[in-house]
């Protein structure tokens, strides 16, 4: 159900509270998921005119789970705070003295419900942390992370019995990784259609038993960061080592991600240097180039009255990854009506060369390769 449809069914006197939750409500580490409401119901009689829903189920993303809490207002007394039912978490009993925004409920503040939900989620986090006492090993993992503020202050935990019959205990740690994304080139961050939200990397580590013999890590990137780093398949984190600890494993993943970010930033500046060198060396032979991301360059060149194009595609992780050179005859066509072309990646190249050296080496390679390309174009293409 979309937020607008849901709000149209809410009692008008309660609408400001719920609107703040579903439109602006981001609670916890996962900034890519908003709060949402379902199961709208009314405690009013059927004779009540207009929208009258005053109770609903609130879905809250937390540590890779979705908490489903029932929130119950009274549409006849909209200035009163709501009641809460915590679904399957019957053992969760919040401390009323710590719910300041509930104790001093201010119906003139449209964010008062959201503020209470945030306080409840904080208490729920403490409740989940306390459950780790059932496993000394998992409690050790938690306490060692807690000693490091960069991890301890950005962590969510979901713990409990995976199987009520066997009593088997499991837990999931969700950590917001302290990785700086601020220097990623803006052109890489703008091609995401949806609301990008915060640029964030979350590491989920699931312990399937209390002794940590089965541990499954997974990395989640916000949409813009995933796009900037080359898609979901571009980053593979290492398996959790047998006998390893989170306090050792998490920094390794942070370093891996930081290195990826640095590769992308370096690649952008190196591509710009590369294209600037080609503009200098080939001058009027440059037909077009990508002036934003510096990922493409096209040259129109001539060798002994034979005109040809060279399309250069520079990869995201340039100069580590070698550019592709595609030679294209301006005279010859394939059977499908396309200009005859050949792509080359087997040519002299070193990622250690600067842009000027790469341009000089490319010019020398063109002179050696064009004769055989011309011969192939005449042999295989059609005029």
From Swiss-Prot:
GO terms for cellular component: BRCA1-A complex; BRISC complex; cytoplasm; nucleus. InterPro entries: BRE. One of its GO terms (biological process) is positive regulation of DNA repair. It is found in: Cytoplasm; Nucleus. Belongs to the BABAM2 family. Component of the ARISC complex, at least composed of UIMC1/RAP80, ABRAXAS1, BRCC3/BRCC36, BABAM2 and BABAM1/NBA1. Component of the BRCA1-A complex, at least composed of BRCA1, BARD1, UIMC1/RAP80, ABRAXAS1, BRCC3/BRCC36, BABAM2 and BABAM1/NBA1. In the BRCA1-A complex, interacts directly with ABRAXAS1, BRCC3/BRCC36 and BABAM1/NBA1. Binds polyubiquitin. Component of the BRISC complex, at least composed of ABRAXAS2, BRCC3/BRCC36, BABAM2 and BABAM1/NBA1. Identified in a complex with SHMT2 and the other subunits of the BRISC complex. This is BRISC and BRCA1-A complex member 2. It comes from Gallus gallus. The gene is BABAM2.
